[in-house]
Amino acid sequence: ALVVEMGGEPVVVAEEDRALYHAGLSHGANFIAGITVQTMRILTEAGISDPALYARPLLEAALDRALTEGTAGISGPAARGDAGTIAAHARCLSARDALAGERNTYADMTRALTRLLREARLLDERAATAVEAALLDPGA
């Protein structure tokens, strides 16, 4: 009933798959919310007074691309293999004690994106290795 109320299509999920189904939806909805909150904290720390105004269009576009294009819809420095930008992001996040949690999430999510892109053959080994190295030593 809740799915229909939210505009979704009901689906029958086998009993043995219900926890996995719920884990998948929780993974998406909860982590999008958490990353969005962290995004707002980073923007606020950068002096942006209304972070939602700046974040909303980009976040909505990224979600739409992910839903329609899958892994191919991932963009940004990890997808480009831009180790220099990744290192700059890691440095500025590390420099702010208030953003320690965001720094950890950034590193974890960059590694996860790199793994997805590598598996989909959208990022070559050399670029992926450079991105991961930039997270380990952002001063390099």
What is the predicted role of each segment?
Residues 60-127:
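Interdomain hinge/lid region at the active-site interface
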Residues 1-68, 95:
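Internal alpha-helical scaffold of NAD(P)-dependent oxidoreductase catalytic cores
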Residues 19-23, 30, 75, 79-83, ...:
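Solvent-exposed, non-transmembrane amphipathic alpha-helical segments
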Residues 122-140:
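Short, basic/aromatic-enriched C-terminal tail that caps enzymatic domains
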